[in-house]
Amino acid sequence: CTQISVAGATSTNDTVVALASGKAGNSKIADEPSSAAKLLQRALTALCQGLCKMIAWDGEGANVLMEVIVEGADSREDARKIARSISSSSLAKSAIFGQDPNWGRIACAAGYAGPKFDVNSLDIALGETKLMEKGQPLPFDAEAATGGGAGRAS
């Protein structure tokens, strides 16, 4: 599930649409889980994820891209709610923008998202740098966690 938030809002200006008319006369690949369907799914997913990042980077004044990945949630909807809560949190966004690897702001936003989760299984990372594992803070290199000033955190 890929979604973007540019300045906390979504508009038709931030939309990507893929359509198929069927006019080529090819067989429908949605009718069966064929290798062609799987290949198309992977290609469209990669394309859309790339376009989402380009749209976000193209936002007025954008100089930081925050990518939130939630794994292990009870459902896709729970994962979506947690990711949206983190990506919409003014405190989490301020920390990322200010290159402050404040895991507490991320954990807080996940906590008030609504879905229940076990804090003792919470892992938080910025890029490849783990900040928290199984609910326990870890020692980390702040510069590595913030990309060394590169302006990108995931």
Name these PLM-found stretches:
Residues C1-S154:
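A structural signal for small-residue-enriched, beta-sheet-centric alpha/beta enzyme cores
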